[in-house]
From Swiss-Prot:
<dbReference type="InterPro" id="IPR018116">
    <property type="entry name" value="Somatotropin_CS"/>
</dbReference>
<dbReference type="InterPro" id="IPR009079">
    <property type="entry name" value="4_helix_cytokine-like_core"/>
</dbReference>
<dbReference type="Pfam" id="PF00103">
    <property type="entry name" value="Hormone_1"/>
</dbReference>
<dbReference type="GO" id="GO:0070186">
    <property type="term" value="F:growth hormone activity"/>
</dbReference>
<dbReference type="GO" id="GO:0046427">
    <property type="term" value="P:positive regulation of receptor signaling pathway via JAK-STAT"/>
</dbReference>
<dbReference type="GO" id="GO:0045927">
    <property type="term" value="P:positive regulation of growth"/>
</dbReference>
<keyword id="KW-0732">Signal</keyword>
<feature type="signal peptide">
    <location>
        <begin position="1"/>
        <end position="24"/>
    </location>
</feature>
<dbReference type="GO" id="GO:0031667">
    <property type="term" value="P:response to nutrient levels"/>
</dbReference>
<feature type="disulfide bond">
    <location>
        <begin position="220"/>
        <end position="228"/>
    </location>
</feature>
<keyword id="KW-1015">Disulfide bond</keyword>
<keyword id="KW-0325">Glycoprotein</keyword>
<dbReference type="GO" id="GO:0048513">
    <property type="term" value="P:animal organ development"/>
</dbReference>
<keyword id="KW-0372">Hormone</keyword>
<dbReference type="GO" id="GO:0005131">
    <property type="term" value="F:growth hormone receptor binding"/>
</dbReference>
<feature type="glycosylation site" description="N-linked (GlcNAc...) asparagine">
    <location>
        <position position="143"/>
    </location>
</feature>
<comment type="similarity">
    <text>Belongs to the somatotropin/prolactin family.</text>
</comment>
Length: 229
């Protein structure tokens, strides 16, 4: 029965995947020369809408990737226990409680999104490399993680331009680090690698949801500041 469920989910994913790609609005802010010059020509309101749409799609695909990974590699008894691995963004100064989120400024909402986005760029590259070593990783999972990784860079570019438009500020940079993912270049054992990759997928899904929620709150504040929750 479990195998049938996995196959059915895979069939639906194959059928819906092209539609998901076709429905996304491009958020490519970068010209060939590496200069952010496309998004600045978009109005602030439209740019925020596109950034939100990107965040929504990234969260949706991260959810699908995590579920697919669970079905393929993680026994039920381990799905709520990630073997003590902490999320890599745990130490970031990002609001977590509802009260904190409601009290922070628009500026800090945007910078929180950017910190989360930038903190995940390199770990997702690592995740792709790790999944490539699996003998049984389905192509759909590999394609989804690659798509999310690419869209995350587009989201970063959009948020950077949004910060400049809304706050008249330059880019906030985060020092990307893979420390704790591959320490001293030593490859983890397969079981450890599977659980570590599962933690990465689960943590990214949570952070992708935060990015989406922060951006939607920001959008709400632009129209009805006193009735946003």
């Amino acid at each position: 029965m479990h195998l049938v469920s996995v196959i059915q989910r895979g069939v639906w994913a194959v059928l819906l995947w092209p539609n998901l790609l076709a429905s996304s609005v491009p958020l490519d802010c970068r010209e060939e020369q590496g200069i952010l010059s496309r998004c600045p020509s978009i109005s602030q309101e439209k740019l925020l809408d596109r950034v939100i749409e990107h965040a929504e799609l990234i969260y949706r695909v991260s959810e699908e990737s995590c579920s697919l990974y669970e079905d393929m590699f993680i026994p039920l008894q381990f799905q709520r226990n990630q073997v003590g691995y902490a999320c890599i963004t745990k130490t970031l100064p990002v609001p977590s409680s509802k009260n904190e989120i409601q009290q922070i400024s628009d500026k800090w909402l945007l910078h929180s999104v950017l910190m989360l986005v930038q903190s995940w760029i390199e770990p997702l590259v690592y995740l792709q490399t790790s999944l490539d070593r699996y003998n049984a990783a389905p192509e759909m999972l590999l394609n989804k993680t690659k798509w999310v990784s690419e869209k995350l860079i587009s989201l970063e570019q959009g948020v950077v331009v949004l910060i400049k438009k809304m706050l008249d500020e330059g880019m906030l940079t985060i020092n990307h680090s893979e420390q704790g993912l591959l320490q001293n270049g030593v490859q983890p054992q397969m079981l450890e690698s599977v659980m570590r990759d599962y933690t990465l997928l689960s943590c990214f899904k949570k952070d992708a949801h935060k990015m989406e929620a922060f951006l939607k709150l920001l959008k709400c504040r632009q129209t009805d500041r006193y009735n946003c929750s």
